[in-house]
Amino acid sequence: MKGGDVMYLEIGAPEAEPVTLEEAKRHLRLVDTIITEIEPEEPGGEPTIITSHPDDDYIKNLIRTAREWGEAFQGRSWITRTVTAYLNEWPSCPLKLPMGPVQEVVSISYFTLEGVEVEVDPSTYWLSPDGVLYGKGWPFAPLRERLGVKIVYKAGYGDASAVPMRCKQAMLLMIGHWYENREEVIIGASSSGAAQIPAAAEMLLYQEREIPI
């Protein structure tokens, strides 16, 4: 392990999912069967008709789980969110920030032996287009024993429209797999008849998979 390796990550939740509930239901070929009529707020107005499916909440959970699975498999962030990385010491070489693509560094700070957080001057570091952090020279102040360096940055492709289609398709494959197979599954060939993780979903995500060095 090199000096200044990322030791802990806090990954914020995205504001939306790459795949909508309606897109997932179309992939599953589900038709809404519940019709809800909401009375108008103004007298004489038209009622609002809302349709839904009994499994809507379950499918929403599958959407979130499929996105989390895909991001973990690739080691990347798909929808913009805030990521906070903690290091035990300053990087001894340029640092590849995890869970990219990295859009911008929001702040870098460190914690003194007394636990006081001090922000670093932004002019002393910069970010390359491939998400590598460079520093002109890090502060010499002694750090607290653990997680003394804190890096906050924005990561992700953007909103849902910016997420690559292969990522969305991998999500849909996993959503369909989990919807049809709600019990334990296995990876690889088996004669027991147990369901398998769809290899196509992984193949779609291999292209930009981050492999830690």
Model-assigned labels for residue ranges:
Residues M1-I213:
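Divalent metal-cofactor coordination and adjacent catalytic microenvironments
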